[in-house]
Regions:
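C-terminal regulatory/interaction regions
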Residues: 2-4, 14, 305-394
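Conserved beta-strand hairpin/beta-sheet module of binuclear metal-dependent hydrolase folds
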Residues: 18-103, 228-246
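Core dinuclear metal-dependent hydrolase active-site scaffold
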Residues: 32, 50, 197-236, 240
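Active-site HxH/HxHxD metal-binding segment of metal-dependent hydrolases
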Residues: 44, 67-68, 76-81, 87-94, ...
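Active-site neighborhood of phospho(di)ester-bond hydrolases with catalytic His/Asp-centered motifs
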Residues: 59-62, 110-118, 137-140, 216-221, ...
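Short, leucine-enriched amphipathic alpha-helices that occur as contiguous helical runs
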Residues: 60, 135, 299-307, 340
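Active-site environment of divalent metal-dependent phosphoester hydrolases
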Residues: 65-66, 118-123, 144-146, 223-226, ...
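Divalent-metal (often Zn2+) His-rich catalytic cores of metallo-beta-lactamase-fold enzymes
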Residues: 226, 232-234, 238-240, 258-311
Length: 394
């Protein structure tokens, strides 16, 4: 492999603040700058990527530190580690500025921001960058509602609370209205205007920004508008893929739509000449096909376990907090939307193929039970659904 890696600044004790540079065979460089985001109860530090292709491009922006602490810890009634509590409110911004300076740039040099998707840890620091640089923002049209709406975070609270209650999860202490007011105060000014909506695959070409070095591939499933960016010219025998949250290592992503996600993983496994996949969290993936096969097997096993756990009527939260369902212990007394949603999407895919069904509602909480048939028969129907791209689930 001709691709070269160089650590310029190592990560700190919270595994952020690091800068690493990847050099392609033709000498062009991709710089990874890692910014703070909580792990275990959050996705972990967020990698931002810097590409100099005639215009300086930043892929994803990270999240303001004070907001990351609230979203992933305080607003979930969780205890905050002293090391995290002591971080300055603009810690992630300082990490970005230090990372840019290490390779000869500053925030004002950024001309284009490309968002891999519309989740909070990927765009909420955008306005901080835009105010200093005047950068334009590009994102897939299918995630613009999440990114552009000043009330998107508040809306997720009002939509999420009844859903998580129906799963059987304990809700945070505050009322929806209390959270709404605080969230509006913190986030309503952080929505972004999408100057350059992406609507098709192929070489980056949006409103005057053109690049044969950056190829866009729509990769839905983690979110409707998730994209991957393949970095490298046609003559490059080895290419880098910036995959956002579609493919992570060693953790596994939390899909928004499991059926769509499994179709995307199939597609990514067919790509050629990808030497390394650089995700937005965690470690690089050096074996693209191997990782996609692992992810397919991982979700098959989780579907199987979900199916077996629902032999008797179970709530979504009972399944999610079952020991062994995740690699980490999920405390059933805690509020954990990511864990609840992960179990929910597996139940919903099983429900689509009639492997499980909703059998009762007790005090607003839904219970599911499996069909009693061998799981292999159920999974065969799931595989048929994945393979038949002509089927859209309403």
């Amino acid at each position: 492999m001709q691709l070269k890696e160089k650590v310029i600044i190592p990560n700190d004790k919270l595994m952020s603040g690091g800068v690493k540079q990847y050099t392609l065979s033709n000498g062009r460089k991709i710089t990874q700058i890692t910014t703070f985001c909580p792990d275990i109860i959050g996705p972990g530090p967020t990698h931002l990527y810097l590409i100099d292709d005639g215009f300086l491009t930043l892929v994803d922006t990270g999240i303001p530190t004070h907001l990351a602490k609230k979203l992933f810890i305080s607003w979930r009634d969780l205890e905050m580690a002293a090391m995290v509590d002591q971080l300055p409110h603009n810690h992630s911004q300082l990490e970005l500025e230090r990372g840019l300076a290490a390779v000869g740039y500053s925030i004002k040099d950024i001309e284009l921001i490309i968002l891999t998707h519309g989740h909070l840890d990927h765009f909420l620091m955008g306005n901080t960058i835009i105010e200093k640089s005047g950068a334009k923002v590009a994102a897939h049209v299918r995630d613009t509602e999440r990114i552009c709406n000043p009330w998107a975070v508040s809306r997720s609270v009002f939509e999420g609370r009844p859903r998580y209650k129906a799963m059987g999860m304990r809700l945070p202490m505050g009322t929806a209205e209390e959270y709404h007011q605080e969230i509006l105060h913190e986030t309503s000014s952080l929505s972004l205007k999408i100057d350059l909506p992406i609507s098709r695959d192929g070489e980056l070409s949006v409103n005057g920004y053109q690049s044969s070095f950056i190829t866009v591939k729509h990769s839905p499933g983690h979110s409707p508008g998730s994209i991957s960016l393949i970095i490298g010219d046609k003559e490059d025998q080895e290419k880098i893929m910036l995959c956002g949250d579609v493919m992570l290592y060693p953790i596994t992503p939390h899909p928004d739509d499991l059926l769509t996600y499994l179709r995307t993983i199939d597609d990514l496994g067919q790509l050629k000449d990808i030497s390394i996949c650089l995700p937005a969290h965690g470690e690089p993936v050096y074996d693209l096909l191997g990782r996609t096969e692992f992810l397919k097997e991982h979700h098959r096993n989780r579907l199987d376990y979900t199916y077996r756990l629902s032999k008797e009527p179970k709530t979504v939260w009972e399944i999610a907090s079952e020991p062994g369902y995740f690699d980490i212990v999920i405390d059933p007394e805690n509020y954990n939307p990511m864990a609840g949603h992960e179990a929910y999407i597996h139940i919903k895919l099983l429900e689509i193929v009639k492997g499980v069904s909703q059998v009762k509602i007790d005090k607003g909480v839904y219970f599911y039970q499996n069909s009693g048939e061998p799981f292999d028969q159920v999974y065969s129907r799931i595989c048929q659904l994945i393979d038949d791209r002509g089927i859209t689930i309403l």
